[in-house]
């Protein structure tokens, strides 16, 4: 059974792409066949896995507009054991082009169905905005949306806006849309603010917050510049252990036995 999770937040800088990359890496480490789809025109997930976004021949953009098959343009990294549908700057133009297409909100989901039986998990990294690209990511989230939330001021306000968006998409496009979980990121236990945000989010969404909390870490900032996930760059760091714990938590909730490879 393939599980499809979309990582989304309309607010940028919350650790969304960082989570997409590192959750994919640890799930692969734990024996899962993982496809990461970069749906963001900034292509940060693509470059963070060592792929030059300027040299991407065909990727998410071409798949969405129908000029390429998703099956033929997935890149596999044998070292990391992750498959990637890369993005490129050309995806920025899709916003205009997709408006004219029929069933434009379901283009990604239609493409994913061609390959979903090849993977245990498909993770989709959305852009930090409410756009037709993000809507495609939400409609494709057959098993839920993972929402990273930065442990900083106004976190709840941004989360409230996103839940309204999810509700609108659920009511108009995909009745099965649900929140898989809220992930608290960039936590600094030395500050009162960080601790207060954790308590506030947990009190407002008691059944949705993951037990794992991702700390603020220089290692998470360094790894993308080297084109590798934290599981390779600094697996024994607090951040590395935290993302490993998140992968274990999700796999356990999904009833998946873990086998490290």
Label each residue range with its predicted role:
Residues 1-261:
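P-loop NTP-binding core
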